[in-house]
Amino acid sequence: TNYPPYNIIKTEENWYELQLAIAGFKDDDLNIEIRDSVLSVKGNKSEEDTNDYIHKGISARSFHRTFTLADTIVVRAADLKDGILTIELENVIPEEKKPRKIAIGGDKTLLTE
């Protein structure tokens, strides 16, 4: 399913925002969890809609959206404002996996046993 629509934005080096357009949902209608590097976002409307619509074009259907994250991605925060759910993600790269510069002609260490 393609609902709800979303954006992924790089905000800084190693920081990202996942934004989902979920107009009409409240904090209590949402469930966000991560398990085995899969981020799951579920939305269920908690209240009955008793309005007598002439036209209903704004979707308020339940949804379940999943995102597979790299092992180095950590979910840091979530916020709901103006119908946009924003989830902050950080790419935490271990020191041993970070690129390092190798000097040419630098000091050499001899290994002795």
Language model features with spans:
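Alpha-crystallin/small heat shock protein
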Residues: T1-E113
